[in-house]
Each structure stands twice: as C-alpha cells, then as structure tokens.
Amino acid sequence: FLSVSSRKLSVLDLDSSLSTGWGPGVLGLSLGWSQGLKAAGALHDIAGLPDFAPRAQFRKIKYGASYFLPFRVAGRDWTFNSSLTGQQAKTTLFGSEQISIGSIYSVRGFVKGSLAGDSGYYLRNDLSTRSVFAPAGQVFPVRWYAGLDMGSVRNRAAGVPQGALVGAALGASVNWQGASWDLSTTCPLATPQGMAKEGCQTWFRLGYTL
C-alpha cells in the first residue's frame, strides 16, 4: 500500500516482471496493476463524478519492456539498450498517479516543457561504446553514448496539455575507483503544436561510492 498524504490516496500495486535471453540479447518484460482503495483514511469518490474529474478509486495498467543487445562492428564492441515504460488508465487520475514525460529520466532534451497524462508511454534508446583514456599513466574507462527518446501522453479531461515529445542526448561517462561522472548534452527534437521549444542543455553529474 502507498499512502499519498497530499491527496489522501491509498493504492494497491501488483507488479510482475520477466527477464530472458532473446536472440543475442536480453529481453525484459513487466506488467502491473494499480487500484485506488478506500482503506487507510483515503479520499472517497462521491457518486456521479463527471468523467473529467480525477478519481481516488482509480484503476490503471502499467507495462514495460527492455532489450539489451551487445554486438561488434568494425573491430569495436557496441551495446544497444532500449526501454519502454507506460500506463493505461481506466479513469481520470490525480497528478501523483499520472505518467510524465520530459526530463533526463524519461524523454531527454526537456526541462521546463514536460507533459503529464492519465495514459501514455516513453521509449528510451541508447547506443554506446567504450574506450580507454590514459593521461599521465592513469587509465580511465570511458563510455560514449548517443540517445534518442520519444514519448506521448493523453488525458481524459478536455483542454489539458497533451501530445508527444522527441529528444536526443550525446554524452560520455567514466567510473574510476568509486567515483563516477557523466557529461551530456540533450536537445529537444519535436514538441506538440503550441508548446515552446527549449534550447539544448548540458548536464554534469558527479557521484562517489564508498
């Protein structure tokens, strides 16, 4: 159960996942169900709510898929990784239960121009290869990657922003002696009509594991 205090929701989540070899790569599948409950002091839906009104006793299907494929071209090792995340709602949802697109964690290339909806998906694709950078005798393994993401959301309520986003990323990451950093540039490629298009963004993330 998940209690969301700002909306007073109680949610039952049932999730399943499967990972298996498929061809030369690894395929992952997931399927889940979320149900808003009346338990634990949750908000109760009143009778006769219009279709556009969000429900506390909602229902939605969650799904996902991923594929990891290593391959070799021109004497160099490459990997292709694709992941799909989505949901299909049976009712209008509160914001905490909607799916959102437009961030470094969903469709890259967007910061201010994100979209949220009752139903939707996002697909992230990365192509990467590795090389070694060795200044002053220190060896740093570098992962170079290019990404192309897309996603779309829909809302049951009329007049709420919805549509599709497409974005791209180009970057490099290093892991060395517990430290990790990632430098990337993300750019928006497509937005819904009427939505302001953002410029490219450069991101730097640094971490350390003890």
Region spans (language model):
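Outer-membrane beta-barrel "beta-signal"
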Residues: 172-176, 198-210
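Outer-membrane beta-barrel translocator/channel fold
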Residues: 1, 187-202
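Short basic/hydrophobic patches in alpha-helices and adjacent helix-turn junctions
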Residues: 127-130, 171-175
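A generic structural micro-feature
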Residues: 6, 138-140, 162-164, 196-198
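C-terminal outer-membrane beta-barrel translocator/porin domains of Gram-negative envelope proteins
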Residues: 1-150, 154, 204-206
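A short alpha/beta connector and helix-capping loop motif
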Residues: 159-172
